[in-house]
Amino acid sequence: MAPGGGRGSKTASYGNSDFVVVANRLPVDQERLPDGSTAWKRSPGGLVTALEPLLRRQRGAWVGWPGIVDEDVDHEDDPIVQDDLELRPVKLSADDVAEYYEGFSNATLWPLYHDVIVKPIYHREWWDRYVAVNRRFAEATSRAAARGATVWVQDYQLQLVPAMLRELRPDLTIGFFLHIPFPPVELFMQLPWRTEIVKGLLGADLVGFHLTGGAQNFLFLSRRLIGANTSRGAVGVRSRYGEVELESRVVRVGAFPISIDSTALDQTARHRDIRRRAREIRAELGNPRKVLLGVDRLDYTKGIDVRLKAFSELLAEGRAKRDDTVLVQLATPSRERVDSYQQLRNDIERQVGHINGEYGEVGHPVVHYLHRPVPRNELIAFFVAADVMLVTPLRDGMNLVAKEYVACRSDLGGALVLSEFTGAAAELRQAYLVNPHDLEGVKDTVEAALNQSVEEGRRRMRSLRRQVLAHDVDRWARSFLDALAESGPRDG
């Protein structure tokens, strides 16, 4: 069945919200307490920070999953108001989480879109569940949106929602943004449901990607898979949008690199408590001459093993000194029920143990590894404390950690080692750019960053900060929504 097929009559009424954000998760998490009751906990993030003021001004609503399993998926709860923000929970059963989220979203789409670092799994049952859950999100959005409202759908878990919502509510202006990389054409063509995904996205008025390459790939696929006429010229960043001509309307396609709340981070990092904590961190590490830092979700795309291998060989070759150089790796737990992630955790912990066994001393490991979430201010203090930030993904849509590190370095200290295969590399050209598949190149670049002169470091960091502070998450959201406003239905 085509996305959205046959369900147009289910929702006839209009909601009250003029602006609706649709994402896999709500900006708050619902938690089950020991007594069986539930409570809400705010889940801070860049997307929430950027869109919250707009949501408040425009009678906004946020549609998403609250984070706990609920088998009664057919019973719709009333909207929840949290801090003047209307939340529309979408319920997911245990089977939904297993097949739509852990299955199709994260064992099919995630590896496919990240260059098949791990082989994608194609299960028809997972696809059927993905269609069903996307329809549930579309119907919840239709009930929330006022007549003529603007709807912004977020990310790879919900790629069918635009077309489903278009069928339910043709009066809406619909935008879609993909937060992960969009794959090369030859990889995307492996997907058995490739045409359905492209048709799903073309339900939007504006389809946004981080990079121009993703936009160009999507235009090509629109021509190849559905025979649409498309623009042929190069797509620009926040400009020169591509176009896909459908029977009754035109879909715009653009590149909008996401960013962070850089001003807030800059201000927090300047606070004396953060500076004091940064000094304490270095003291707790034994006051080494150099501190290298990695901060990642524990994910096979992030290249954690690459930096550990490079550091191990630098120690073995004497190019990094075991008595005055340490590596701190902060790894946030992620998708722990998925087999490949469990294996990755075991592999990383084995690698850390080997390096410390080979080069550390009792009470003085050379790699400090934490596998747990780190509070926000503690993370900022680590950014301030680190001499070299290691961001070495094999593929990443953007990588906001790189930008966060730069935003925290008002002292113009530190060095950023950044994978060429992140979206951030297109903007942060003054970082030490590396190919994470080239181990010798990674080692040489890390060594250069460790030994850079003060003048060289300040020059690079000044340029990086100019970029990050000027292009913040508010500018990202405004640029997308301005383009969307120009793309929607003309007749209301």
From Swiss-Prot:
Binding site for UDP-alpha-D-glucose: G45, G46, R297, K302, L400, V401, A402, K403, E404
Root EC class: transferase
InterPro entries: Glyco_trans_20 (IPR001830)
Keywords: Glycosyltransferase, Transferase
GO MF annotations in UniProt: alpha,alpha-trehalose-phosphate synthase (GDP-forming) activity; alpha,alpha-trehalose-phosphate synthase (UDP-forming) activity; trehalose-phosphatase activity
Pfam families named in the record: Glyco_transf_20
GO cellular component: cytosol
Reaction(s) the record says it catalyses: ADP-alpha-D-glucose + D-glucose 6-phosphate = alpha,alpha-trehalose 6-phosphate + ADP + H(+); CDP-alpha-D-glucose + D-glucose 6-phosphate = alpha,alpha-trehalose 6-phosphate + CDP + H(+); GDP-alpha-D-glucose + D-glucose 6-phosphate = alpha,alpha-trehalose 6-phosphate + GDP + H(+); TDP-alpha-D-glucose + D-glucose 6-phosphate = 5-methyl-UDP + alpha,alpha-trehalose 6-phosphate + H(+)
Transmembrane segments: none
Origin: domain of life: Bacteria
Keyword Transferase among UniProt keywords: yes
Record-marked site positions (Involved in alpha anomer selectivity): W110, I180
Enzyme Commission code: 2.4.1.15, 2.4.1.347
A Gene Ontology biological process term: trehalose biosynthetic process
Binding annotation for D-glucose 6-phosphate: R25, Y101, D155, R335
Pathway: Glycan biosynthesis; trehalose biosynthesis
Function statement: Probably involved in the osmoprotection via the biosynthesis of trehalose and in the production of glycogen and alpha-glucan via the TreS-Pep2 branch involved in the biosynthesis of maltose-1-phosphate (M1P). Catalyzes the transfer of glucose from UDP-glucose (UDP-Glc) to D-glucose 6-phosphate (Glc-6-P) to form trehalose-6-phosphate. Probably also able to use ADP-Glc, CDP-Glc, GDP-Glc and TDP-Glc as glucosyl donors.
PANTHER family the UniProt entry points to: BCDNA.GH08860 (PTHR10788:SF106), TREHALOSE-6-PHOSPHATE SYNTHASE (PTHR10788)
Annotated family: Belongs to the glycosyltransferase 20 family.
Assembly: Homotetramer.
Name this polypeptide is given: Trehalose-6-phosphate synthase
Protein's organism: Mycobacterium avium (strain 104)
